[in-house]
């Protein structure tokens, strides 16, 4: 048993399957340390679930991973599957995910002088379909708004002072308090007085005969969308610089 390094007791039922020659001594040692030992399975026994505390596989052939689920079903809750192979088997060593999918956890791979590949995996002591009751302590259903509703309410009228009531809206300050017509006040400091004092250019006959010549912005001929606010050509159609502006016959006719 030293080569297997297993911990068995007289209360355990063990299944041991071996294709290695001269394994009778190992089987006899397992019988001495366990309650019962089974060395082969019939088809009917393969369908029995939760039957063994320990399943031991000793083989010189590559392990068939398709049998993992069958061995897992044969194990009782908390049981162990141990695989001993006389040859190195990297595929088995790296198949931890296959064992997990098959229902086994705590996958471990080792080796010793006798067995080049040793794998152990456990069946959980809990069932994947088990459910348990969780006792959640009851909480008091206090009204979360009670502390707010019970407090003193603020009168919204107290938030407005007398100065706030008599002050004029900011929208009336744009015309310097001279009425709806926007004119510069006597002591204007916003720049409106200077704007009103500027002489706006007027359209002359020369400008119509020879339009756009000497334009400072160069956009006069492009139409109102590109003309300055004080452009004398505003309202006139587009034209070519230096060519007389030709007004259509219905230019001064109201559209309505």
UniProtKB/Swiss-Prot annotation:
Task: List every stretch annotated N-terminal SAM-like domain.
Answer: 1-136
What's in the GO CC field?
A: cytoplasm; mitochondrial intermembrane space
Q: Which cofactor does it need?
A: [2Fe-2S] cluster; [4Fe-4S] cluster
**Which residue ranges does the record annotate as region Linker?**
137-166
One biological process term from GO is: iron-sulfur cluster assembly
The UniProt entry, under InterPro entries, shows: Anamorsin, CIAPIN1, SAM-dependent_MTases_sf
Q: How does it assemble?
A: Monomer.
The job of this chain, per UniProt, is described as: Component of the cytosolic iron-sulfur (Fe-S) protein assembly (CIA) machinery. Required for the maturation of extramitochondrial Fe-S proteins. Part of an electron transfer chain functioning in an early step of cytosolic Fe-S biogenesis, facilitating the de novo assembly of a [4Fe-4S] cluster on the cytosolic Fe-S scaffold complex. Electrons are transferred from NADPH via a FAD- and FMN-containing diflavin oxidoreductase.
Q: What is this protein called?
A: Anamorsin homolog
Tell me what organism the protein belongs to: Dictyostelium discoideum
Which lineage do the record's taxonomy fields give for this organism?
Answer: Eukaryota, Amoebozoa, Evosea, Eumycetozoa, Dictyostelia
Q: Gene encoding it?
A: rsc43
